[in-house]
């Protein structure tokens, strides 16, 4: 790391001390064999599908029955694209929370969720909005349920 800090490319690329600290922590995690637990992207990529499904069901259970019905919410098996680095086209099995009862309601829900705080991004397929629960951290389950409840309340 000290050689990297002194390298002329460091100045040319404007690598700041926070970036170097993050890189150093990541490399230490790999060296210690803890990267799968401590690097969020790796943890998401290697999480068992059963855990992802369970988290999707937890989000669904956090929705009030009337909200669930209004959204047409349910859990479905899906696939996600890793989409970068050495695996740009690799598909990964996942579980998604799917909402929307028609093309119009799906578009309104998508817009409401994207414009929310925090923004929630999904993808639309077959007139339904799919929210990949592999990318939802356990601590975000309540936030996602709240965002869906707010989106369902919008006209």
What would you call each of these model-derived segments?
Residues 53-139, 143:
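Conserved C-terminal alpha-helix-loop-beta "cap" of PLP-dependent enzymes
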Residues 150-155:
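Catalytic-site microenvironment of enzymes
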């Amino acid at each position: 790391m000290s050689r990297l800090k002194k390298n002329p490319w460091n100045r040319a690329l404007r690598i700041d001390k926070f970036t170097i600290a993050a890189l150093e922590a990541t490399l230490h995690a790999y060296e210690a064999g803890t990267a799968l637990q401590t690097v969020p992207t790796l943890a998401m990529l290697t999480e068992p599908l059963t855990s992802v499904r369970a988290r999707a069901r937890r989000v669904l259970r956090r929705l009030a029955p009337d909200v669930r019905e209004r959204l047409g919410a349910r859990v479905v098996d899906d696939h996600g694209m890793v989409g970068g680095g050495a695996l740009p086209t690799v598909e990964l099995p996942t579980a998604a929370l799917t909402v929307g009862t028609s093309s119009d309601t799906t578009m309104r829900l998508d817009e409401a969720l994207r414009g929310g705080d925090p923004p929630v991004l999904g993808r639309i397929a077959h007139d339904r909005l799919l929210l990949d629960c592999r990318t939802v951290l356990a601590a975000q389950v309540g936030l996602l349920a709240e965002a869906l409840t707010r989106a369902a309340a919008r006209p």
